[in-house]
Amino acid sequence: MSVDGCLSALLTRGLVRTRPAADMLAPSSLLSESGAPLPLDHARLLSLSNGLDAYGGYFRVFGVGPWSVRDMRRWNAPEGWRRAWDGRADGWWFIGETAWGDQYAYATGDDPLEFDATVYRLDACRLEAEPVAPCFADFLRDELARNATAPRDETTVAARRRFGDLEPSVQLTYVPSLLAGGDEDLAHVVELGAREAMTLAGDSYRAVAAVAAATA
């Protein structure tokens, strides 16, 4: 199914919230500072909707510029939340996320002509990556559409019942973090701004890694 067909099906079923179309001729439409453009299927979506969110804001696809779901270039800025991860966010261009902070991303390299269109998911605790789709169109059709209909993660379903719909600028995070030994109980989940949540997750990862290194 094409990007157009997939988006139309999602809209017909009321499964996503869209934004006005992006200007894909603007400099902000570039993939990264190296100048690699977005894959054509990804650019096509943004030319129809400048990002989107699904399942009440629990799954997000970023856009470009200030009127998007979230501006990819600002989100990927090295001086932002990525700095807290001590290099673990390097080599990735983040294009979306779940409400828990799991990031969807492309792997990036030095040569923009050798671009890998595979979409990866990086978990919010360690930024460990796994491929979820060979291209953006498949990501939209499979990963996003499936979760927009019925998320496979029961905790996400329970969280929506507890917290309701979320703004795309907000993430849910466990306090204390699961990595630091926190309980996987929704009573310990709070809403934070996405940048603050990802920074705290990076700080937690570094602290746990430092303890592990010291006791090795």
Question: How should each PLM-predicted stretch be described?
Answer:
Residues 1-106, 110-111, 161, 165-216:
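A surface-exposed partner-binding patch
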Residues 115-152:
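Compact, glycine/acidic-enriched structural inserts
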Residues 144-172:
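Short aromatic loop motif centered on NTY/YTY
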